[in-house]
Amino acid sequence: MWVLGIAATFCGLFWLPGLALQIQCYQCEEFQLNNDCSSPEFIVNCTVNVQDMCQKEVMEQSAGIMYRKSCASSAACLIASAGYQSFCSPGKLNSVCISCCNTPLCNGPRPKKRGSSASAIRPELFTTVLFFNLALCLAHC
């Protein structure tokens, strides 16, 4: 019986406060010309349990590449992304691409390639393991 008490304490102290999910994203609401808004001053905390994704919009125009980034709800982001899919042709003039992602700062610059990624923890793997552990914990609490 004491094992259940320890498990309940562990779940209460470490898992339940973390159920309020908040993500950080890069945000520049106004289009930025040739500035991908990926420096620290553009980092924001998204609205807890509402804005669960980061969104990136890239428009290629004759003047240069325009960027807009923000926090978004998964529904709004996925609808916008799907709606503009036919206009997304990277490298072509007047292309508009909208992408959605759900890991911290995922709408920032592409990470620099550093040798083998086998030793690095991939965010999607970490998220999967985290949710699996949460499910196990809730099943036993």
From Swiss-Prot:
Its subcellular locations are: Cell membrane
| Keywords, ordered alphabetically | Cell membrane, Disulfide bond, Glycoprotein, GPI-anchor, Lipoprotein, Membrane, Signal
Lipid sites, type GPI-anchor amidated glycine: 115
Q: Name one GO biological process term.
A: protein localization to plasma membrane
Q: Which residues form the signal peptide?
A: 1-20
User: What are the recorded GO MF terms, alphabetically?
Assistant: acetylcholine receptor binding; acetylcholine receptor inhibitor activity
Instruction: List the propeptide region positions.
Output: 116-141
Domain UPAR/Ly6, residue spans: 25-108
Question: GO CC annotations?
Answer: membrane; plasma membrane; side of membrane; synapse
Bilayer topology: Lipid-anchor; GPI-anchor
Q: Which residues are glycosylated?
A: 45
Keyword Oxidoreductase carried by entry = no
Q: How does it assemble?
A: Interacts with CHRNA4 and nAChRs containing alpha-4:beta-2 (CHRNA4:CHRNB2) and alpha-7 (CHRNA7) subunits.
* Function in brief: Believed to act as a modulator of nicotinic acetylcholine receptors (nAChRs) activity. In vitro increases receptor desensitization and decreases affinity for ACh of alpha-4:beta-2-containing nAChRs. May play a role in the intracellular trafficking of alpha-4:beta-2 and alpha-7-containing nAChRs and may inhibit their expression at the cell surface. May be involved in the control of anxiety.
Protein name (database record): Ly6/PLAUR domain-containing protein 1
Please tell me the species this chain comes from: Rattus norvegicus
